[in-house]
């Protein structure tokens, strides 16, 4: 990703280390002082980011190119807000449980905003704020969670390879092949110790 494209992407996708306070999950939870995380660091964890034209997603050639190159054949739209999502509070709590999937999770924010939290190489939470125009891909096997921010609204495009399978495996599920493959590819070393991804 070129510097200009990265700068534009950082306008709609920003990341920082969480303060780990247990109060309202919908707040930013910056550390004091703030510790921002670059898109390059997210990429080291397997998290991919793009900035796209959310107002013209139906005709966006870049979205089409990404979908074709990555095999995202299925698409649907969902709105996470009290008025549109049945059992809203229950669902928001469920999304915020730390979990992984055996396939990629792909979300494209068409309106509103929300937080995706992921773990770094030392198992410390990074908060990723995705706003309108941000497309983010989480690799299979990465532990993560989601919450809307204090605006309580996000309209997202969900993309899938094949059918819309969304099965969450709450932590711990380190025995799953997708987790082992993720650890082998991205978490080879934590601190000074090697991870045995075959265990």
Curated annotation (Swiss-Prot):
EC number: 1.13.11.54, 1.13.11.53
Pathway annotation: Amino-acid biosynthesis; L-methionine biosynthesis via salvage pathway; L-methionine from S-methyl-5-thio-alpha-D-ribose 1-phosphate: step 5/6
Keyword Iron assigned: yes
Cofactor: Fe(2+); Ni(2+)
SUPFAM superfamilies hit by this protein: RmlC-like cupins (SSF51182)
Cellular localisation: Cytoplasm; Nucleus
Keywords from the named record: Amino-acid biosynthesis, Cytoplasm, Dioxygenase, Iron, Metal-binding, Methionine biosynthesis, Nickel, Nucleus, Oxidoreductase
Note describing how the cofactor binds: Binds either 1 Fe or Ni cation per monomer. Iron-binding promotes an acireductone dioxygenase reaction producing 2-keto-4-methylthiobutyrate, while nickel-binding promotes an acireductone dioxygenase reaction producing 3-(methylsulfanyl)propanoate.
First-level EC class: oxidoreductase
GO cellular component terms listed in the entry, alphabetical order: cytosol; nucleus
Keyword Hydrolase (UniProt): no
Positions bound to Ni(2+): 99, 101, 105, 144
Its job: Catalyzes 2 different reactions between oxygen and the acireductone 1,2-dihydroxy-3-keto-5-methylthiopentene (DHK-MTPene) depending upon the metal bound in the active site. Fe-containing acireductone dioxygenase (Fe-ARD) produces formate and 2-keto-4-methylthiobutyrate (KMTB), the alpha-ketoacid precursor of methionine in the methionine recycle pathway. Ni-containing acireductone dioxygenase (Ni-ARD) produces methylthiopropionate, carbon monoxide and formate, and does not lie on the methionine recycle pathway.
Family: Belongs to the acireductone dioxygenase (ARD) family.
Name of the protein described by the UniProt record: Acireductone dioxygenase 1
Phylogenetic placement of the source organism: Eukaryota, Viridiplantae, Streptophyta, Embryophyta, Tracheophyta
Gene from which this protein is expressed: ARD1
């Amino acid at each position: 990703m070129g510097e200009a494209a990265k700068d534009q992407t950082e306008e709609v996708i920003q990341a920082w280390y969480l303060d780990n306070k247990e109060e309202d999950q919908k707040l930013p939870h910056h550390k004091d002082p703030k510790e921002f995380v670059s898109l390059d660091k997210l990429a080291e964890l397997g998290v991919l980011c793009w900035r796209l034209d959310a107002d013209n997603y139906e005709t966006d050639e870049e979205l089409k190119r990404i979908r074709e190159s990555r095999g995202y054949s299925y698409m649907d739209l969902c709105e996470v807000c009290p008025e549109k999502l049945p059992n809203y509070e229950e669902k928001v709590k469920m999304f915020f449980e730390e979990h992984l999937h055996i396939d990629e999770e792909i979300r494209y924010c068409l309106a509103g905003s929300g937080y995706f939290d992921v773990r770094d190489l030392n198992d410390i939470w990074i908060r990723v704020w995705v706003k309108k125009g941000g497309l983010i891909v989480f690799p299979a096997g990465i532990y993560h969670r989601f919450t809307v921010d204090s605006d309580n609204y996000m309209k997202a495009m969900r993309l899938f390879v094949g059918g819309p399978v969304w099965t969450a495996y709450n932590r711990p599920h380190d025995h799953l092949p997708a987790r082992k493959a993720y650890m082998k590819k991205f978490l080879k070393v934590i601190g000074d110790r090697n991870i045995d991804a075959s265990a």
